[in-house]
Amino acid sequence: MGFCIPSRSKMLKRGSRKSSSILARRPTPKKMNIVTDLENRLKKNSYIENTNQGNILMDSIFVSTMPVETLFGSYITDDYELKDLLNVTYNIKPDIVPDIKLDAVLDRDGNFRPADCFLVKLKHRDGFTKGALYLGHSAGFTATICLKNEGVSGLYIPGASVIRSNICQGDTVSRSSRGVQFLPQIGGEAIFLIVSLCPTKKLVETGFVIPEISSNDNAKIAARILSEKRKDTIAHIDTLIQHRQQLELAYYNSCMLTEFLHYCNSYAGTIKESLLKETIQKDINITHTNITTLLNETAKVIKLVKSLVDKEDTDIVNNFITKEIKTVEVLKQRQNS
C-alpha cells in the first residue's frame, strides 16, 4: 500500500545509527528493571529524524529485549499456512494484538502505529536460503519479536550490517521496511511475531522523506555463507539421527540373534540342525560388522556437527537429537501395539 508524502526532497543516504559487528550473538537476556513512565518513554525508539531538510525516515537498526508473556496465546493454535517454495519454507498466519501490548516497539514521538501483525513459525529445516519475507508498509517500520525458540534461530535484515546468529525469546529487531530473512532453523521450533508499523495521520500530514536505502555487501555475503553453513549442519544432524536409529535397530537384532543362538545351544539334543546355528552366527557377525561401521560413521558425523555448531548451542542440538530419537521410538511402539 502507498500514499503521497508531502514535501519530498532530495533523497538522502543514511547509514545505521547503531554500530555493531556483522555477525552478532546476544547473551542470555537479563531481567528488565522497573522504570518510570518518563524513563520508559525516553528509552523508546525514534523512527523519524528532524533535520533542516525536514523529517527523515531513519534507516537504522533498533535491537532490544522486551517481555513477551502478554503476547502468548494465539500462537499456540496450529492454524498456520505452510509456505514451501524454492529456497523458502515457513508457516505463517495473521494475528490480532492489542496496541497496548506492543508499546515496547512504538516510537516515542507517536509517529507510527501498529497496523498488521503476523505470526511466523519455523521448524527444524525451515527458513530462507535466499530472498526475504516482506510484510508491512513500504514507508514504515517492521518489528520482529521472538516469542519462542527451542532451537537455534537467526535472522538477517537485507542490506543491513547486522546478522543475529542466535535469537533468544524476547529479542526484538526493528528496521525500516526492508523485509526479514530467517536463517535456516536448527532443531526445535521458533515462533516470531512480525508487527507492521505504519505512519500516523499526523506524520503523513507533516510530511517526511524516505532516504535511499543503504546497502552492505559484506553482510549479504556473510548471511549467504551462514545460511549454507546451517544447511550443512542440518543435513549432518539429520544423518546423525538416522545413524542413531539404525544403531538401535542393529543392537536389537544382535541381542535377538544372540538369544536365539543361546536357545539353540541349550537344546542341542533336540535341535541337531547345525546349518541353522551357522546361519544365525553368520547373521550375528554381519550385524556386529554393521554396528562397528555405524559407530565409525556416527563418530565422524559428530565431529562434523561439533565443528559447525557454536559451543553455546551444543546443548540445544544434543537435546533436539535426543528428543527426535525418543519421538521416533514412541511412534514405532504405537504402530506395533
Curated annotation (Swiss-Prot):
Supply the InterPro entries for this chain. Poxvirus_F11 (IPR007027)
Q: Which UniProt keywords apply?
A: Late protein
Q: What induces it?
A: Expressed in the late phase of the viral replicative cycle.
Q: What biological function has been recorded for the protein in this entry?
A: Stimulates increases in peripheral microtubule dynamics and may increase the motility of the infected cells, contributing to cell-to-cell spread of the virus. Seems to inhibit the signaling via the GTPase RHOA and DIAPH1/mDia.
**Sequence similarity:** Belongs to the orthopoxvirus OPG055 family.
Task: Please report the name of this protein according to its UniProt entry.
Answer: Protein OPG055
Q: Which organism is it from?
A: Vaccinia virus (strain L-IVP)
